[in-house]
């Protein structure tokens, strides 16, 4: 869980947001971690675990992350091909059809025009790759209990909407 919590990126381009952003939000991590653990428990050392996550956003769009993970020399390797890529409903449906035909391989990509991973403590980029993190799982930061983070803007908006709905009922 800590490994996913400490993955950050900077956006590139004219429409970039300010500052460094987290790749995975807390709600995504809570959903993904049990599935990733289960996948690694049945994978052979030569297999990779493919991870695709969607964070729901307003106006019928989702943000997609896609990466593959594998363990080599006590390090978790995570290679991304998509980070916070906006998807409409139609895009999502066509993606599902595409994945039944072909699988993309993020290790064959060296960078993205839209983002760059920013290594945290105990992490480094694979040489010549801006999209591939190597996480040293023996680093003490990944041995610590998970710290609850402040919610995302979307999570805060949802809490406010829930509170307003409760007050209307009273």
Label each region the model flagged.
Residues 1-3, 76, 85:
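Primarily extracytoplasmic ectodomains and periplasmic/lumenal surface modules that are beta-strand-rich
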Residues 1-45, 50, 159, 169-170:
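N-terminal Sec/ER secretory leader and immediately downstream segment
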Residues 83-158:
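Polybasic, proline/glycine-rich intrinsically disordered low-complexity segments
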